[in-house]
Regions:
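Metabolite-binding pocket within alpha/beta catalytic cores that recognizes anionic/polar moieties
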Residues: 23-176
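Generic non-transmembrane alpha-helical segments
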Residues: 34, 38, 183, 187-198, ...
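Non-catalytic positions within long, well-ordered alpha-helices that form the structural scaffold/packing
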Residues: 122-123, 222, 241
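Metal-dependent peptidase/peptidase-like ectodomains
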Residues: 166-204
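Active-site/ligand-binding-proximal alpha/beta "capping" segment
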Residues: 194-227
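Zn-dependent metallopeptidase/amidohydrolase metal-coordination segment
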Residues: 231-269
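His/Asp/Glu-rich mid-to-C-terminal helical/loop segments that flank catalytic regions of hydrolases
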Residues: 258-306
């Protein structure tokens, strides 16, 4: 009898996951189709702008800006500093899509919802994704206002964005070496030297939030190898990597913790520090986007970068 009950539970769970996959697939396709109808160009580069970094959008020659609330199936950001706009335009002469505002796990969204926009970007033809965030610095060599190129990450989120039925954009068990594209990291260094911009490199720790870290947590993350810590980016990067999209990530160090005399921090202070970093962030990101168009993808470009609509259908 107990065995029968377990079999029934397993069958119900499997059916639930299958139905969830189908529903999510249909939403992704519906949203992508709706946005494609609005597109007049076919950009292959996208940027996700985080806390206090939305002003980079002012550098974009906007062709069209759509509020998230007007896009079918799109979540709506609830965080101050995240205005919630999907922008088509040009930056440095390059056609791009910019997401002004992102979605966080701590807002109550599931990981499928947090990473939903990345799935849509993939369906729109995006091959390169730039992600930015505001983060707490744990490396003693960092200063407030520093830019840190993300070379790797540590995932401390309690739910994994690839949990559930596997999407055919990548393997069931994706390798995570060189998640952040080495050629783009090298390019950032070249630009920083040319522009005499102070640039750091390090490991970003992704956590759930919404509380800022305790001094003990800062020390733990630092001991584990983290250089900055924040409440975003990692889920988006994992899904983009699974889709075969090349990724460049950068953090603005907006506060410092984990040292002998940690100081209290507020969201307002984080925004203020991020705002002050706007000029150099804008300069380096503009150059990155323009020059990245001329870079070949890494030799180990992964998985399926074609848009497997028919394959999705066959698995649903």
């Amino acid at each position: 009898m107990i065995v029968v009950v377990f079999i029934v539970i397993f069958a119900v769970e499997k059916t639930f996951q299958q139905n969830l996959f189908i529903v999510m697939y249909e939403k992704i396709q519906e949203t992508a189709s709706w946005l494609k109808a609005k597109m007049v160009t076919h950009p292959t580069t996208a940027i996700i702008l985080g806390t206090g970094l939305g002003r980079l959008a002012e550098e974009i020659q906007v062709e069209q800006a759509i509020d998230y609330k007007d896009i079918p199936n799109f979540p709506v950001s609830t965080v101050e500093g995240h205005s919630g706009k999907f922008i088509f335009g040009k930056l440095g002469g390059v056609d791009i899509i910019a997401m002004k505002g992102r979605f966080h796990y701590y807002e109550g969204y599931s990981m499928k919802e947090v990473t939903f926009p990345v799935r849509v970007l993939y369906e729109l033809g995006i091959k390169t994704l730039f992600v930015s965030n505001a983060a707490g610095g744990m490396n003693p060599g960092f200063k407030i206002g520093d830019l840190m190129v993300i070379t790797d990450h540590i995932n401390f989120f309690p739910e994994h964005p690839l949990r559930g039925k596997n999407y055919p954009t990548g393997p069931r068990f994706p390798d995570m070496h060189e998640t952040y594209d080495p050629s783009l990291i090298k390019l950032a260094g070249q630009i920083a030297r040319e522009k005499k911009i102070r640039l750091q490199y390090g490991v970003y720790v992704g956590v759930q939030g919404p509380t800022f870290e305790t001094p003990a947590e800062y020390r733990m993350y630092r001991t584990l190898g983290g250089d900055t810590v924040g409440m975003s980016t990692v889920p988006e990067v994992i899904v983009a990597h699974h889709c075969g999209i090349r990724i460049f990530g950068i953090s603005v160090v907006t506060d410092l913790g984990g040292f002998d005399n940690p100081v209290e921090v507020s969201h307002e202070e984080v925004q203020e520090a991020a705002d002050k970093a706007q000029p150099i962030m804008t300069e380096i990101m503009r150059e990155m986007i323009v020059r990245s168009e001329k870079l070949e993808h890494s030799k180990n470009e992964r998985y399926n970068t074609d848009h497997p609509t028919e394959e999705w259908k066959s698995q649903s």
